[in-house]
């Protein structure tokens, strides 16, 4: 289990646009951290950098003091408005992802489906899922490998009160398991009720701790 993630002066440029500027952040295991800010402020890009989906232009990203290749962190990520294969069932989508990543077992998939409350509908095609059900399935794929680091981008969008409570419960359970949990949200209740530390991002800059 990764004990600490450190971002040192992370900057990300796309063309002539600077999306992230000199981001410094340290996160420790068993804690829930929050990032808030307006749409387009850089929250999702920061998540993508930590997950390894994009590389920073400058700066260091360290896991227990090591680079990604040496540390080989297990990272689960739930990105807002992401999608899966529409003609596959929820369970089939998870099995496909598991076969690609080669980290989750059938038991892990079963556990994730139960935890997000999709057992009654896991054989329904993704196309027929409601927005809330799609969010739950995306959460399931993020947690099914019991990640060291769990990144959640607006996880409570498009879900009802019961779903919000479920997301909060899973975040707390993952932190209790020892994971580092990072939540990006503009929902004040999510941020205030769950996170030990909250950071504000504006125009790619981490301005202050709330």
Question: At which residue positions do the language-model features occur?
Answer:
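The feature captures the beta-strand-to-loop junction immediately N-terminal to the Walker
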Residues: 36-38
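Conserved ABC transporter NBD signature motif
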Residues: 59-71
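Helix-to-loop junction immediately C-terminal to a conserved catalytic motif
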Residues: 51
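Catalytic Walker B motif of ABC-type/P-loop ATPase nucleotide-binding domains
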Residues: 150-154
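Conserved ABC ATPase "signature" region
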Residues: 95, 106-122
């Amino acid at each position: 289990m990764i004990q600490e993630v450190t971002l040192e002066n992370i900057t990300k440029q796309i063309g002539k646009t600077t999306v992230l500027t000199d981001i410094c952040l340290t996160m420790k295991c068993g804690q829930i951290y929050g990032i808030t800010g307006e749409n387009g402020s850089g929250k999702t890009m920061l998540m993508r950098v930590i997950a390894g989906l994009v590389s920073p232009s400058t700066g260091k990203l360290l896991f227990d003091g090591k680079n990604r290749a040496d540390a080989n962190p297990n990272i689960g990520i739930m990105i807002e408005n992401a999608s899966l294969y529409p003609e596959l069932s929820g369970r089939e989508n998870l099995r496909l992802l598991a076969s690609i990543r080669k980290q989750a077992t059938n038991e892990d998939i079963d556990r994730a489906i139960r935890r997000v409350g999709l057992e009654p509908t896991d054989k329904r095609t993704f196309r027929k899922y409601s927005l809330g059900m799609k969010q739950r399935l995306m959460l399931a794929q993020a947690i099914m490998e019991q990640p060291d680091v769990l990144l959640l981008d607006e996880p409570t969008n498009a879900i009802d009160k019961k779903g919000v409570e479920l997301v909060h419960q899973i975040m707390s359970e993952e932190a209790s398991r020892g994971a580092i949990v990072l939540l990006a949200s503009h929902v004040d209740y999510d941020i205030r009720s769950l996170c030990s530390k909250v950071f504000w991002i504006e125009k790619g800059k981490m301005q202050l701790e709330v």
